[in-house]
From Swiss-Prot:
Domain of life: Bacteria
Listed name of the protein: Glutamate--tRNA ligase 2
Lineage: Bacteria, Pseudomonadati, Pseudomonadota, Alphaproteobacteria, Hyphomicrobiales
Cellular location(s): Cytoplasm
Swiss-Prot/TrEMBL GO biological process terms: glutamyl-tRNA aminoacylation
EC number per UniProt: 6.1.1.17
Primary localization: cytoplasm
Catalytic activity: tRNA(Glu) + L-glutamate + ATP = L-glutamyl-tRNA(Glu) + AMP + diphosphate
Subunit and partners: Monomer.
Protein's organism: Methylobacterium sp. (strain 4-46)
Gene name, Swiss-Prot/TrEMBL: gltX2
GO cellular component entries: cytosol
Keyword Glycoprotein listed: no
HAMAP family tied to this protein: Glu_tRNA_synth_type1
Keyword Nucleotide-binding carried by entry: yes
InterPro entries: aa-tRNA-synth_I_cd-bd, aa-tRNA-synth_I_codon-bd_sub2, aa-tRNA-synth_I_CS, aa_tRNA-synth_I_cd-bd_sf, Glu-tRNA-ligase_bac/mito, Glu/Gln-tRNA-synth, Glu/Gln-tRNA-synth_Ib_cat-dom, GluQ/Sye
Length: 447
């Protein structure tokens, strides 16, 4: 059976490279196996979820090349969660509790002070009907906890191998808040069961949560999916990534000029047994994805690696991929092929191409470091048409006429022709600059 997977972000902020990682793992897993990828927007937190962030998530995934086969919003599915909660209440697995957060905190501190684990003591299960009525009369509304079965919860994880969590070490989780709204846990299980999710691929910070959800799946009589808990992406210093790090948001990285392929390559291959390298498309990354090869150690994200991957993708980008973007920069189609061949090895971001086109087409302000050399070089410019051999034959003639060689010859010519002391090989740029513009620049004119 083809797998069905999902990515379930909360639309409370922009996606960053850290939560792009599970999105990519799921999308690539589905792509490799011919399965389906579902985007589920966990927007039940109405105070923090916004339509703008929801739209941004869809846009950012599209930038990475991920287009969901189906998109769902939890806010449209409340009736399903209500029905599931009623089933759990009827089965005695969901029970009301009336403690305030302050009362729970005091109880937790007492347990810690006595050297006990801070696990909820199920005091609510011992309340009499009269005690519950008294709480209701004073205005308290219950939150609802899921009663965990005792003993170990086990599963075979596609990343971590055999896993088990002792349910006795966990507090009965709150599934429904006092106002009737749902926390993440129950809606996630209900959706996974109703949609037919076969594999849940997510960060290792969900391992304990998985034990709880497995019990909820079983309590609802639903099939338990296969789980895979990958390592988390951190900063180079080991700090966890968060939505507060705006420069690492996908749109922040996009605005800085990074290619989606560079971001995807780093997000997927970091922290695995695969060498981190630039993979230009998702099909190539899907072929490399093997969850069994994902490390259990933290995956450290180094921006320097992203710079290198970005440059590599640009240096190897074929003209067919670059041509529409060159046209968008205003570069004529007739010049696109020779221009791209000349400059791509010097690009850190694609937008750098616009700067090199200004060097070619002008106006560029020349720097005349050696007026005598510039004048002699102008006089020796050969007639057009020019090609990639023109630079060599021309500079050999200038060398013979002036006796200059090496840096003393080439740097003044580069400064005069481009106004810069560095850049692409002039054998590729000179034919694009052209004879008339080259002559004017060698005379010190902006052209």
């Amino acid at each position: 059976m083809a797998p069905v997977v999902r990515f379930a972000p909360s639309p409370t902020g922009y996606l960053h490279i850290g939560n792009a990682r599970p999105a990519l793992f799921n999308a690539l897993f589905a792509r490799r196996a011919g399965g389906r990828f579902v985007l589920r927007l966990d927007d039940t937190d109405t105070a923090r979820s916004t339509p703008e962030f929801a739209a941004a998530i869809v846009e950012d995934l599209a930038w990475l090349g991920i287009v969901p086969d189906e998109t769902l919003r939890q806010s449209d599915r409340i009736a399903l969660y209500d029905a599931a909660a009623e089933r759990l209440r009827a089965a005695g697995r969901l029970y009301p509790a009336y403690e305030t957060s302050d009362e729970l905190e005091r109880r937790r501190r007492r347990q810690l002070g006595r050297g006990l684990p801070p696990v909820y003591d199920r005091a609510a299960l011992r309340l009499t009907a009269e005690e519950r009525a008294a709480f209701e009369a004073e205005g308290r509304r219950p939150h609802w906890r899921f009663r965990l079965d005792p003993g170990p919860v086990t599963w075979t994880d596609l990343v971590r191998g055999p896993c088990h969590v002792e349910a006795d070490s966990l507090s009965d989780p709150v599934l429904v808040r006092e106002d009737g709204s749902y926390l993440y846990t129950l809606p996630s299980v209900v959706d996974d069961a109703e949609i037919g999710i076969t594999h849940v691929i997510r960060g290792e910070d969900h391992v304990t949560n998985t034990a709880v959800q497995i019990q909820i799946f079983r309590a609802l009589g639903a099939a338990v999916p296969v789980f895979a808990h990958h390592n988390l992406l951190t900063t180079a210093s080991g700090e966890g990534l968060s939505k507060r790090l705006g420069h690492l948001s996908l749109r922040g990285l996009r605005d800085q000029g990074y290619e989606p392929g560079a971001v995807a390559s780093l997000a997927v291959l970091t922290g695995s047994s695969e060498a981190v390298r630039a993979v230009p498309d998702l099909d190539g990354l899907a072929a490399l994805l093997d969850l069994a090869h994902v490390s259990r150690a933290p995956a450290k994200f180094d921006p320097h690696d992203l710079d290198q991957l970005n440059a590599r993708l640009l240096h190897e980008m074929p003209l067919a991929a670059a041509a529409p973007r060159l046209a968008a920069l205003g570069i004529p189609a007739a010049a696109a092929e020779p221009f791209w061949a000349a400059v791509r090895a010097n690009l850190a971001t694609f937008s750098d191409a616009a700067g090199w086109w200004r060097v070619v087409a002008g106006p560029a302000a020349p720097l005349i470091a050696d007026p005598a050399l510039a004048a002699r070089a102008a006089a020796l410019l050969p007639p057009e048409p020019w090609d990639a051999t023109t630079w060599k034959s021309w500079t050999e003639a200038v060398k013979a006429a002036t006796g200059l060689k090496g840096k003393a010859l080439f740097l003044p010519l580069r400064l005069a022709l481009t106004g810069l002391d560095h850049g692409p090989d002039l054998s590729g740029l000179l034919p694009l600059i052209g004879r008339e513009r080259a002559q004017r620049r060698l005379r010190g004119e902006a052209a």
